Regions:
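S-adenosyl-L-methionine-dependent methyltransferase catalytic module, highlighting the catalytic core
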Residues: 107-110, 114, 120, 124-234
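A structural signal for well-ordered alpha-helical scaffolds and beta->alpha junctions
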Residues: 23-24, 39, 183-184
Length: 234
């Protein structure tokens, strides 16, 4: 049923964006004729699936890139809080890396609900964001403006982790600011509130990040942990 809906949507999408019948393969993967598994790379920036996690990098997975910034040439230009152009239950997975913290807390809840909506019943979410518990430990010891680690964009301080990378926050890039934060407990709570039933999460204090795998319909603890081996880094 959703396949026919997706085919109609593809025609509207192609007309709106000037695409001909030789659609990009990523967009074609929204149709009912796509073979293989599909994951939505939310807030992708310039990254491709090779920059995600090993589980998504195999040929078994088709990547669909979504970003609000048209300059990064995503397959779909949209906000993660409104993905209404993506049919319900279409996708096998959603990957969200370091973008939920750019939303206010209420917006983050909306985004998580959207992630849940577009997933098939056996689909899952992989999400990562800063670990505020690890950052708070540095701040409590008066290291607010000292380098916590060095990223490809340069040195990162606890201040950058909390509020957004200051070297990038220049007009018109103010949307790069951070507006919410999570510990592992509060991230799990937010994901469950959005409708996900089972979660497997870890803290990586030395990397100052959280990783969470959430299944839409529910798996046994053992099955969830096996799945996490390919999609959650050590």
């Amino acid at each position: 049923m959703w396949g026919a809906w997706a085919d109609r949507w593809l025609k509207r999408f192609a007309a709106r964006h000037g695409l001909n019948e030789a659609r990009p393969p990523e967009i074609q993967c929204l149709s009912s004729h796509c073979v293989g598994k599909r994951f939505l790379h939310v807030g992708c920036g310039y990254s491709r699936k090779q920059q995600t996690v090993p589980g998504f990098q195999s040929d078994d997975w088709h990547e669909i890139r979504l970003d609000a910034n048209a300059d990064v040439q995503p397959d779909i230009v949209a906000s993660m809080t409104d993905m209404s152009m993506v049919p319900d239950g279409l996708l096998d997975a959603v990957f969200s890396s370091h973008n939920i913290e750019h939303l206010y807390l209420e917006q983050a809840g909306t985004a998580l609900t959207e992630f849940h909506r577009v997933l098939a019943d056996n689909g899952f979410l992989v999400i990562t964001c800063p670990d505020m518990q690890a950052v708070a430990a540095l701040i409590a010891n008066d290291h607010l403006d000292e380098t916590a680690y060095v990223s490809p964009a340069g040195p990162v301080t606890p201040f950058d982790i909390v509020y957004g990378m200051q070297s990038l926050l220049v007009a018109p890039e103010y949307y790069m600011a951070h507006r919410s934060c999570f510990t592992l407990r509060t991230l799990i709570a937010a994901v469950r509130k959005a409708g996900f039933t089972e979660c497997y999460g870890i803290r990586r204090p030395e990397q100052f990040d959280l990783w969470l795998l959430a299944h839409k319909q529910g798996l046994s603890k053992e099955a969830l942990e096996r799945l996490a081996q390919d999609f959650i880094p050590n």
